[in-house]
């Protein structure tokens, strides 16, 4: 597949950022998120038929992006230091590309990291020559009329909720909807600062190195997509619920996460040395509605904290229901009382260091789950219809990103593992029973 970039420009906010908003203070949760860019890729079939319509589409995207940056001004700024963003209206990157001889279905039917990476403004392990907090790339597939829009967000100031709300606002401006009525909350709370709730802290070089290592990429990582059908998930949820003596009924994310974690355990049990006694599962939890008073849902930043479940790796048959319920308990304990204690008197760092020690415990394997489900990404209609497929791409070791399938019932899991483990993971009985690989979506 050959994709050629035809233009690149910097999009500035349509209105200058007021002086009193020139500095956006980071929270400690922003500080620990790392400075990598994470992508969301939206695929639209049959959007453009000629150069005139391509130009109109690009102009619309750029104009509405400029308007959106006025509300989300930190995304047009630059990281000033470890405590703040300079909202200097430098702008965001916008790249236009053409795939003259390729059909978009080639990617959607059997996506690979290499294919998806070509749709990004920058490669996954590439540092932009000029640091940006947001970069977008639109790729037109001239052979079929399809289009892919990739938006990359800096993890310093965005979690998946922030990213989804940014795209929703961008769509609102592009479609010409009235942003002064139903979207008042977006305008009012888009840059609600959380530094007063989760104050920033000075990090030691050790903590900073640990965070960087946890976000590093590796050529020895293999990333694949596993599709969990909605009907199979529903049956799995019902089975788990019937087996629970406590009345527990799993969510879609908890049920699918249990199958994935069971697959990782299976890999560990097949290892020649079998030296990991536990699997430490980490799942990002949205804090917006878990504190009192709640933080506005539209607020930007990394308003998430990890739920941690330490799961014993045993020779006996894997109990998926128990895995799901243990993960559920680790999520549910993150409430207002827990968060106030965790962050009280600047205690976040000491508590975080206790967690980080688990990363380097030779008896534990760490696996991270990021659930992007129940976000309105499939509602992103800029004026040419809703996306046929929404995806991401990553290479972080021992990570799974979960997204809704297009029907809203299933889940697509992007799983990144060391190459030596992926073949074993694919053959795990739970994965074979509940997931499929390389299934055509459109």
Swiss-Prot record:
Q: Sorted alphabetically, which keywords does the UniProt record give?
A: Acyltransferase, Transferase
Q: Which family does it belong to?
A: Belongs to the plant acyltransferase family.
Q: Which organism is it from?
A: Citrus sinensis
Q: Where is the active site?
A: 155, 381
Any one Pfam family here would be: Transferase
Function of the molecule: Acetyltransferase involved in the biosynthesis of limonoids triterpene natural products such as limonin, a compound with insecticidal activity responsible for the bitter taste in citrus. Catalyzes the formation of (1S)-1-acetoxy-luvungin A from (1S)-1-hydroxy-luvungin A.
This enzyme catalyses: (1S)-1-hydroxy-luvungin A + acetyl-CoA = (1S)-1-acetoxy-luvungin A + CoA
Q: What is the lineage of its organism?
A: Eukaryota, Viridiplantae, Streptophyta, Embryophyta, Tracheophyta
Its protein name is Limonoid 1-O-acetyltransferse
